[in-house]
Amino acid sequence: MTILAWCIAWVLDFIIGDPQHWPHPVRWIGRLITFVQRIVRRYCPGDKALRIGGGVMWVVVVGATWGVAWGVLALAQRIHPWFGWSVEVWMIFTTLAGRSLAHAAQEVERPLRKNDLAESRIKLSWIVGRDTSQLQPAQINRAVVETVAENTVDGIIAPLFFLFLGGAPLAMAYKAVNTLDSMVGYKHEKYRAIGMVSARMDDVANYLPARLSWLLLGIAAGLCRLSGWRALRIGWRDRYNHSSPNCAWSEACVAGALGIQLGGPNNYFGERVDKPWIGDAQRDISVDDISRTIRLMWVASTLALALLIAARCGLSGVA
């Protein structure tokens, strides 16, 4: 039944994703973060106090998320086993973001194919932190490919990884870790102190999933009739060409698979950030690379699910 729940949740994400008006735990987690952050800022003046308060905020948000998820599942199971199972499927489904990621990328891709730069820049600004107002088509393509490659880890592979380790409650706790990082884990002045713990704990949580993504995306590249060997080679060579210890694993693998370069200079919050280049520019990046990257994401996601099912069967001895 556990494996069936995983599969149904994955299929639901593949088919319908996250409908905008449906209730979603990540939105609730975001509201909790906003509430706790307001309290921390009120009572923790100064950088040192903010760092400590940020650590407390991380424990409160992640702990509360795990506890509520565990409690809701336990209560649902007591009401009826099938109800508990249905709630588990829903929880797992909400931790996966493959369809949402693909949809967001396609929202940028469509106007870009029509040479509508203004619209593609606006749509891109919804999913990236960099300044998109002056980006040219190649830069927009690169930003979308990077976003899909990076979020293949924290939107799909990592939730499945923590689902395997600790069930739906731990997968939900991971989403809290990831949401904390996306809301406060920045290096500029406003968040540097309060978000330090959140940023570092996100690095810790994604350490193994990011490295697993290198292998899965490399295999996916071969299955998609791209260069799997080059994906693995470039992925390994450029795995540390990023300020994050995790992001370049998937980005470099995708760059190798496609034969393009990612990274380079960008503007964030009004400041120029010069990132190392990732991959070799064997050809110019094109809008078609967006759809190729989405395909890589889905194949890697399928491989991740299959791997974890096989591991579960191997450990439990049952299908």
Curated annotation (Swiss-Prot):
Disulfide bonds: none annotated. PANTHER family: COBALAMIN BIOSYNTHESIS PROTEIN CBIB (PTHR34308:SF1). NCBIfam families: cobal_cbiB. Belongs to the CobD/CbiB family. Its main location: membrane. This is Cobalamin biosynthesis protein CbiB. It comes from the Bacteria.
